[in-house]
Amino acid sequence: MARIAGINIPPQQHAEIGLTAIFGIGRTRARKICEACDIAYSKKIKDLTDGDLEKIRDQIALFTIEGDLRRETTMNIKRLMDIGCYRGFRHRRGLPMRGQRTRTNARTRKGPRKAAAALKK
């Protein structure tokens, strides 16, 4: 099993798909990494040589991924909340921040419905 950026990549997957197991790498970035390393997208992870894996690690080191990316995202949201802007306010209240309606729908952000009887008391 190949270990890249602290993540175990499933050996039976193709290189392009296997790289997407790393947070911060999607299909497009995985393809670009494979192109830069001269590796076929359809080549299985278990068939990659140690040299190929080292090339992939070097390419991935150029990007912000995994813990650093998660930390950066969290800090961006925290900054929005600290400066008190509209988006930060919506994050703090757990509501959608991109203009969606909230009178109905928005259940993903708001969570399960509260009982109507409990609200009237």
Curated annotation (Swiss-Prot):
Sorted alphabetically, which keywords does the UniProt record give? Answer: Ribonucleoprotein, Ribosomal protein, RNA-binding, rRNA-binding, tRNA-binding
Query: What superkingdom does the record give?
Result: Bacteria
The reply to whether Membrane figures as a keyword in the UniProt entry is no
Q: Which GO terms describe its cellular component?
A: cytosol; small ribosomal subunit
Q: Where in the chain are disulfide-linked cysteines found? A: none
Give the matching Pfam families: Ribosomal_S13
In residue numbers, the region (Disordered) covers: 94-121
Q: Which GO terms describe its biological process?
A: translation
Alphabetized GO MF terms: rRNA binding; structural constituent of ribosome; tRNA binding
Q: Which family does it belong to?
A: Belongs to the universal ribosomal protein uS13 family.
Role played: Located at the top of the head of the 30S subunit, it contacts several helices of the 16S rRNA. In the 70S ribosome it contacts the 23S rRNA (bridge B1a) and protein L5 of the 50S subunit (bridge B1b), connecting the 2 subunits; these bridges are implicated in subunit movement. Contacts the tRNAs in the A and P-sites.
Q: Which PANTHER family match?
A: 30S RIBOSOMAL PROTEIN S13/40S RIBOSOMAL PROTEIN S18, SMALL RIBOSOMAL SUBUNIT PROTEIN US13M
Subunit relationships? Part of the 30S ribosomal subunit. Forms a loose heterodimer with protein S19. Forms two bridges to the 50S subunit in the 70S ribosome.
Q: Name the NCBIfam families on file.
A: uS13_bact
* Protein's recorded name: Small ribosomal subunit protein uS13
What species was this sequence derived from? Polaromonas sp. (strain JS666 / ATCC BAA-500)
